[in-house]
């Protein structure tokens, strides 16, 4: 099935489950502990119980390690029995992420 968000991806995602915390939902405040499905150096696909709007910003942090970032919601789609799958683009990363940026 064609999905428009896949056309703009500049990096291949790596399937990897990483425990993370996300926060910053305007209508449902609080911190949500969840996991990634796939990752790259500049973003991740994460599952959430909440519906997010495209271009919303949220706080993203790993449970283990020291990585954190403000992230932009690139897309949000319903995910059966889980809630929603969201594509995140890291905007202000700090610390060590599980995938290093490509050398330029």
Q: What residue ranges belong to the model's regions?
A:
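Structured alpha-helical
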Residues: 1-104
């Amino acid at each position: 099935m064609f999905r428009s968000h896949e056309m703009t991806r500049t990096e291949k995602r790596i399937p990897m489950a990483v425990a993370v915390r996300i926060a910053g939902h305007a209508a449902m405040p609080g911190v949500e502990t969840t996991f990634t499905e796939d990752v790259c150096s500049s973003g991740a696909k994460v599952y959430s119980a909440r519906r997010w709007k495209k271009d919303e910003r949220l706080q993203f942090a790993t449970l283990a390690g020291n990585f954190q970032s403000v992230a932009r919601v690139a897309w949000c789609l319903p995910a059966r029995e889980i809630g929603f799958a969201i594509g995140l683009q890291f905007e202000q990363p700090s610390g060590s992420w599980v995938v290093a940026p490509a050398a330029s």
